Amino acid sequence: MIDFKFNYADISIVPERRSRVDSRSQTDPYDENHMLPIYASPMDTVVCKENLKDFLDNRINVIVPRTIKIEERIQLAYDRSIFFAVSISEAEKIADYVEGFEIDQYIPMFTGRKYKICIDIANGHMDRLLRVARRLKKQNECEITLMAGNIANPETYIDYEESGIDYIRVGIGGGSACLTASNTGVYYPYFSLLKEIYEIKKRMGGNAKIIADGCIKGYRDIQKALIYADYVMIGGLFNKAIESAGKTTYGKRYWNVNGNKIFRPLTTLFTYGKEIKRENFPRVMKLIKEGKLVVWKQYRGMSTKEAQKNIDENAKLKTAEGKVFYQKVEYDLKGWVENETDYLRSAMSYTNSFTLEEYKESPTVVNMSVAYNQ
């Protein structure tokens, strides 16, 4: 018997026969902190210290990325009560510090404070990650909320839950700038992966939050993911916002590589040419909306050589599992968030759901031809 697995494009949400929701304005699409159930991916072409406030002001959860120096990363996150990303070796150093070992002095004093730490690695199935997670959660010097991942085996949820991890990033190989699936063959269709993890969570009475990370191609995929996920993490869609961290250039031409047109302005191949400064973004967005200017954002996976070099200029370069390309700027964060909030409210009203918790229990989905779901 063939065990079919599904991606977001393979399914569609069926409205409830009857809905108690008279207007989508009656629904509550926010979490307990009054934020949307969405995280901006900690990628260096999505999030930077200059746009943290932009995301937070628009009710988008954000993680301080690893491209910022560790001292500043920790302080930025602590001041805003948000997550900061660390490598697994940085997580081990923090564990050493709070356990009283002699370590590098750049780690600030953690005693008596509350921190939110995201162990940001590609392969979240390593025993090494689980070991450091247990150390961080068992120490008594400070209160740590821990996010980790990514995982793509449903049963790994059990190990994360038992290790005390609070937020689990789910999904490998589905990002638009990720080449892991195509080059390694490692992949698990996202919708089925989330469903199976959610069922394991319910069966064992788990508390860890599920974050759907990757394969989000548009608004509707967010609504589909939230049937089983507590949050959705977004990279490529946020890169298309004028406020994103990617290098911002303007021009209408494409760069032709091996006969394929990719989103790279010809004049910026090596120098990034006509780069737009952040202080000019509001004026530029006005010109974009008026159809007077075409603007591009550089987007790249965090497993690219360029991104790894940005994290550590002394990094030993290896074979990349990501790609670099340009995307056209299509909106500002405020406009995107207004759309997504209304679309999520609408999906909730169709499925007889006043809250996100009710939404998880409500939707019926059907498998359908991808051709009908475009």
Stretches found by the model and what they are:
Residues 1-19, 185-212, 216-374:
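Alpha/beta catalytic cores of nucleotide-metabolism and tRNA/nucleoside-modifying enzymes
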Residues 1-209, 236-241:
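Active-site entrance/lid segments in N-terminal catalytic domains of soluble metabolic enzymes
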